[in-house]
Amino acid sequence: MNNQQKIKCPICGKQNTWSPDNQFRPFCSERCKLIDLGEWASESRKIPGSSIDPESIVTSNNKQDNEDEQ
């Protein structure tokens, strides 16, 4: 019995099989995989959320370092 799930490529919508044989899953091809990577790299795709002030990260890390030293 073949229980391989059919999925749509998130880039082009082409039907493909979710299986270990598909090295590009969930994409249908290397081309679609690279298009997706390019969209993330150019920030046209991003995870929604609020921006983080880089200065607050430095301050937070410095506080943690000081606490670790004590």
Curated annotation (Swiss-Prot):
UniProt keyword annotation of Membrane present: no
The keyword Mitochondrion belongs to this UniProt entry's keyword annotation: no
Cofactor binding description: Binds 1 zinc ion.
Region feature (Disordered): 43-70
Cofactor(s) annotated in UniProt: Zn(2+)
Annotated keywords: Metal-binding, Zinc
Gene3D superfamilies recorded: Erythroid Transcription Factor GATA-1, subunit A
Subunit: Interacts with GyrB.
Family: Belongs to the DNA gyrase inhibitor YacG family.
Name by which UniProt lists this protein: DNA gyrase inhibitor YacG
Organism, scientific name: Legionella pneumophila (strain Paris)
Classification of source organism: Bacteria, Pseudomonadati, Pseudomonadota, Gammaproteobacteria, Legionellales
Gene behind this protein: yacG
